[in-house]
Amino acid sequence: MTDRVIVGLSGGVDSAVAALLLKEQGWDVHGLFMSNWEEDEDGYCTAAQDFQDARAVARELVIPLHRVSFAAEYRERVFQHFLAEHRAGRTPNPDVLCNREIKFGVALSYARRLGAARFATGHYARILHSPAGAELHKARDAAKDQSYFLHAVDIEYLADTLMPIGELEKGAVRERAREAGLPVFDKRDSTGICFVGERPFREFLGRFLADRPGAIESPEGERMGTHRGLAFYTLGQREGLGIGGRPGHAELPWFVARKDGARNALIVVQGHDHPLLFSSALSTGAMHWLSAARREPFSCAVKVRYRQADQAATLEPHDDGSARISFEKPQRAVTPGQYAVVYEGDRCLGGAVIENVEAVSARRAAA
């Protein structure tokens, strides 16, 4: 049995320290740099610089570095779904699909062809092993935990994966990198999706989706303006609505509360805590369980977006594999297309795409 481990080296400090720790543990470490998006002429995607940084890390650690492009697979398996969801008026999370289809799909298969016994990443999460099998747990650093993005990966793939920085705080990761002389110890963390980069999101989306203007309306049907297309907005959004002060309305900001696809209308409300922004429950698509599927209702914690605090809820499984999740407290801006991820303590049980939400009554939202 080989003791080779392939580490996904992104050019950032987290994966660099993951490689460092594994080498210190005696593994035969190889780095793998993945290009998942063709860098454009505007320079928003930083893949070229990231590769140079990954190469510098590999040189410092004296480990081989393999470079491979999964751009075609990414476009087919992740980006096309991303566009289709936006066309349908939903708000997808491509990072979840990227982990399932690319990092723990084609990249893991590629690592095995390179003779790896294990695959490793710089994710802030923990894989724990028990007699019952592998489990996905939150990272020690709650502020950096990335288990939300990993819930859709098959547990047998996670079982063969090492995530050595999941036990560390971010500050300790940077300190280890500095002590080891890794050139990326002070590199800024990447933000957003590579193919969007630092550019305005709607500017990027407009390169692929045509405008489809329609009415911006109040819940009572009053026309408040014109939107560019439902694909360019998400629930809870405040910026970019173009609604100023209006006679007969309070001096409060406007927020997107709902998308009416049948009429191509964007429904907006005033006030951050308007009741129409809150949901008491949601319905999911097919649940992806990281352990045996639950058959009976049970109490759990749920996140409906990354970095959200755990929310107390009850999950009711359905015979078709979907579920209904009802919240102890109303949740703001629960968004179809995003993911509801389920936890028991620090353990991630799985999750699913949010399909529909149930509005909360004005009385309960104010409670």
What do these predicted regions represent?
Residues 38, 120-128, 132-367:
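AMP-forming adenylation/ATP pyrophosphatase catalytic core
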Residues 1-151, 162, 171-172, 256, ...:
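ATP-dependent adenylation/nucleotidyltransferase module used to activate substrates
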